[in-house]
Amino acid sequence: MALSSTQAIPETGDIPRHVAIIMDGNGRWATRRHLPRTAGHAKGVHAVRRVVEACGRRGVRYLTLFAFSSENWRRPADEVSLLMRLFVQALEREVDKLQDQGVRLHVVGDLSAFEPKLQELIAQAQERTEHNDRLHLTVAANYGGRWDILQATRAMLRADPGLAQDPDRIDEARLAEHLSMAWAPEPDLFIRTGGEQRISNFLVWQLAYAEFYFTEQFWPDFGADELDAAFEWYRTRERRFGRTSAQLRGGAKR
């Protein structure tokens, strides 16, 4: 299980070890160009490819992308249908590239809601890349932070039914080991494109001590230069994890 930022002080550096991104603004990017919203989602796939490659080159070890939230089912049916098709196409087209780049793919979320073909493709892609370790790419699909905490609670109680009668034995570490990304360190840097400033039910537990970076740039236009700007901002942050600035003097700020 990964180290918790509320239980210990994680090691940090100039390059965030774990970057989490809400890829927002696809629809607005398309609307401003008098294109259907679906065109923006298609263009956003290219941005994913750019950012995965850029993170790998810069030494990021974990990249988590919010692809489809549990609330996105509320969108128009044709848009949801296209997003599902894009997911299928990306898995079919990109898995060989991920393998060549040493990228391990993880998909987290309630995958039972997807069609069997998509579930099968997800399983195959994860199995194909499971021995890679250069970059861990996690795609959150039909994911919600509250769902994650609920499913972890249920899994914890199934693993140890006696906890229901002795709740004082429940602590952060016991619950955290059942979260969908228990194997990964908590994000150091959270990025949201598109100008909105909220986390939208993404990694509610895991973002406790992440640095939050918001940019007006729409996701289809986001690439290596924009990622470098986020990293440059990140290097200015004083990551205290509950300590005072005085305690950090003479040592590393992050």
From Swiss-Prot:
Residues annotated to bind Mg(2+): 24, 211
Free-text remark on how the cofactor is bound: Binds 2 magnesium ions per subunit.
Active-site residues, record numbering mapped to chain: 24, 72
Signal peptide extent: none
Gene Ontology molecular functions: ditrans,polycis-undecaprenyl-diphosphate synthase [(2E,6E)-farnesyl-diphosphate specific] activity; magnesium ion binding
Enzyme class: transferase
One of the Pfam families matching this protein, by short name: Prenyltransf
GO BP term, pick one: polyprenol biosynthetic process
InterPro entries per record: UPP_synth-like (IPR001441), UPP_synth-like_CS (IPR018520), UPP_synth-like_sf (IPR036424)
Keyword Magnesium (UniProt): yes
Keywords of this entry: Magnesium, Metal-binding, Transferase
Gene3D superfamilies in alphabetical order: Decaprenyl diphosphate synthase-like (3.40.1180.10)
Record: residues binding substrate: 25-29, 37, 41, 69-71, 73, 75, 192, 198-200
Domain of life: Bacteria
Enzyme nomenclature, EC number: 2.5.1.-
Family note: Belongs to the UPP synthase family.
Quaternary structure and interacting proteins, as annotated: Homodimer.
NCBIfam families: uppS
Function as written in the Swiss-Prot or TrEMBL entry: Catalyzes the condensation of isopentenyl diphosphate (IPP) with allylic pyrophosphates generating different type of terpenoids.
HAMAP family: ISPT
Protein's name in the database: Isoprenyl transferase
Organism, as annotated: Bordetella pertussis (strain Tohama I / ATCC BAA-589 / NCTC 13251)
Gene from which the chain derives: uppS
